[in-house]
């Protein structure tokens, strides 16, 4: 005995790629997603440059953890590091900082809740 099953073919909707702006804001947001990284940025913003040891002395975390947070900020492009053997000097990447300010500003402006929306 044969049983015929009726099958439906569903057209798979193509998933859209994220825009470069969405990708960039996600990278910045990820880098800003930890209080230690925010503290590092506050610390660097008050100075032109500073060394790893200065940053470590300011934060209540291990050196290895400071390194990981600096790497995350550097990978996102929010800071830059310059080797001055045997030390590394860090500063805020001003160009990318301006880009971050612009795209976050646009993001919040464009995603604002309308008065008649379900947001309260």
Language-model segments: which ranges?
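Amphipathic alpha-helical dimerization/coiled-coil segments
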Residues: 1-25, 43-46, 94-120
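N-terminal helix-turn-helix DNA-binding core of bacterial DNA-binding proteins
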Residues: 23-62, 84-96
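Residues within the DNA-recognition helix of helix-turn-helix
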Residues: 69
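Glycine-centered, phosphate/nucleic-acid-interacting loop/turn motifs that mediate DNA/RNA or nucleotide
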Residues: 77
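Juxtamembrane helix-loop transition sites at the ends of transmembrane segments
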Residues: 54-55, 63, 110-115
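Short beta-strand "wing" residues that participate in macromolecule-binding interfaces
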Residues: 81
């Amino acid at each position: 005995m044969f049983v015929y099953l009726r099958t439906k073919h569903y057209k798979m909707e193509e998933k859209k790629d994220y825009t470069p702006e969405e990708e960039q804001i996600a990278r910045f947001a990820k880098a800003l997603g930890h209080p230690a990284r925010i503290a590092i940025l506050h610390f660097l913003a008050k100075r032109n440059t500073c060394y790893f040891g200065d940053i470590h002395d300011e934060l209540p975390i291990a050196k290895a953890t400071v390194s990981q947070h600096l790497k995350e900020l550097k990978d996102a492009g929010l800071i830059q590091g310059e080797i001055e053997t045997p030390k590394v000097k860090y500063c805020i990447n001003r160009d990318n900082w301006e880009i971050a300010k612009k795209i976050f500003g646009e993001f919040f402006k464009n995603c604002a809740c309308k008065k008649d929306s379900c947001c309260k």
